[in-house]
């Protein structure tokens, strides 16, 4: 009799809600994958440079969207498989996308630092010697992030005795790097907003300082807030007030390290976290580095051997910025540009006078000499 009086257990989230969320998440990531794939195809279509900041960004975002779409596709019928993956597959689907996001953040730092260096190199050429150390710095930071993430993920799956210690090390190292890169990106954006040459540099790409600042600040806030959340919540995991809200499964928001399976409510929150802290910033990066159709500007000033255009896009022209001197040709002071324009005018006048003289001489020739065939 007592058995019949016990309440019936029911899932925390109805099955149709779980299915609907899975379909929605998968569609979002698939749409982003298709959009990035089209952007990479347009790079070939418009004959842009195949290896540039733009193509590297897009390729990283393409790989990230593919891995996330593959992860959520497991939750249609293979929930158990998704929660009991092997060590490498677990790292590839759950952890490696976070590494890809850190790579994009590091690459954004490198890109905007290059903007500052190139703008300053017009008057301080000695700054170019810092290019190689800058590349090596961000490469070493990215490799450190990757190695720590991979090692800790494998240790969690292989040896669960020290899971909390391993996760603490991973979160401390990786999320600290996230915060440092976010601060560095903020400083770069602040310097760009204060530099007139950098403003011209960005406007030549077809964007504005306000747009760059808005996207950059949003990405910085999203990435840094996620990293700070991981650090704070992991430091407070022993406090009962947090566990009482049943949030202990994701005390690390990028990987469910401390719980082997995700419950129904945990799955919903996991998807929301990925949407806000991953899909949104990645979509902003893809939008910023989208491929534009190259346009011809008739207002460009032409001189023998060089062409200057106020709308020459930074990424879109395949023959621009192949060397360090290209920025100096695209961003020139007013007095130098005026002298180039006057020289171009004198050269064109002499060319026109020579053409007029030639036509006058030819007018004295006989008709059969003008058309010998």
Curated annotation (Swiss-Prot):
GO terms for cellular component: lysosomal membrane. Lysosomal integral membrane protein that regulates the localization and activity of mTORC1, a signaling complex promoting cell growth in response to growth factors, energy levels, and amino acids. Interacts with Rag GTPases and increases the lysosomial localization and activity of Rag GTPases and thereby regulates mTORC1 translocation and activity in lysosome. Also acts as a negative regulator of osteoclast activity. May be involved in interleukin-4-induced M2 macrophage polarization. Also acts as a negative regulator of osteoclast activity. May be involved in interleukin-4-induced M2 macrophage polarization. One of its GO terms (biological process) is autophagy. Disruption phenotype: Knockout zebrafish are viable and fertile and display no obvious morphological defects as adults. However deficient zebrafish have abnormal microglial with expended lysosomes. They also display increased bone resorption. This is G protein-coupled receptor 137Ba. It is found in: Lysosome membrane. Residues 37-55, 106-135, 198-213, 290-373 are cytoplasmic. It comes from Danio rerio.
């Amino acid at each position: 009799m007592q058995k019949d009086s016990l309440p019936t257990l029911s899932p925390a989230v109805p099955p149709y809600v779980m299915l609907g969320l899975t379909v929605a998440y998968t569609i979002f990531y698939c749409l982003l994958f298709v959009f990035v794939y089209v952007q990479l195809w347009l790079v070939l279509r418009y004959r842009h440079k195949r290896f540039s900041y733009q193509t590297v960004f897009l390729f990283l975002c393409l790989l990230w969207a593919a891995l996330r779409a593959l992860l959520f596709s497991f939750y249609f019928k293979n929930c158990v498989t998704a929660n009991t993956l092997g060590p490498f597959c677990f790292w590839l689907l759950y952890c490696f996308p976070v590494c890809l996001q850190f790579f994009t953040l590091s690459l954004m730092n490198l890109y905007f630092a290059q903007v500052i260096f190139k703008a300053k190199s017009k008057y301080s050429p000695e700054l170019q010697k810092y290019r190689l150390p800058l590349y090596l710095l961000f490469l070493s930071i990215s490799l450190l992030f990757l190695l720590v993430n991979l090692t800790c993920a494998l240790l969690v799956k292989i040896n669960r005795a020290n899971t909390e210690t391993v996760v603490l090390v991973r979160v401390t190292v990786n999320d600290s790097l996230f915060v440092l890169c976010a601060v560095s990106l903020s400083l770069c954006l602040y310097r760009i907003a204060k530099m007139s040459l950098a403003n011209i540099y960005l406007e030549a790409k077809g964007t504005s300082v306000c747009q760059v600042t808005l996207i950059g600040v949003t990405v910085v806030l999203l990435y840094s807030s996620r990293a700070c959340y991981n650090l704070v919540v992991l430091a407070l995991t022993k406090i009962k007030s947090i566990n009482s809200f049943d949030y202990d499964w994701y005390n690390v928001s990028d990987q469910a390290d401390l719980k082997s399976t995700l419950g129904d409510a945990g799955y919903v929150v996991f998807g929301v976290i990925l949407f806000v802290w991953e899909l949104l910033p990645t979509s902003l990066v893809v939008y910023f580095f989208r491929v534009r159709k190259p346009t011809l500007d008739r207002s460009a000033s032409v001189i023998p051997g060089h062409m200057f255009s106020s709308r020459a896009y930074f990424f879109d022209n395949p023959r621009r910025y192949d060397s360090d001197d290209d920025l100096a040709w695209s961003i020139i002071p007013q007095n130098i540009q005026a002298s180039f324009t006057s020289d171009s005018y004198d050269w064109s006048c002499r060319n026109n006078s020579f053409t007029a003289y030639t036509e006058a001489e030819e007018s004295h020739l006989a008709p059969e000499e003008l058309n010998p065939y």
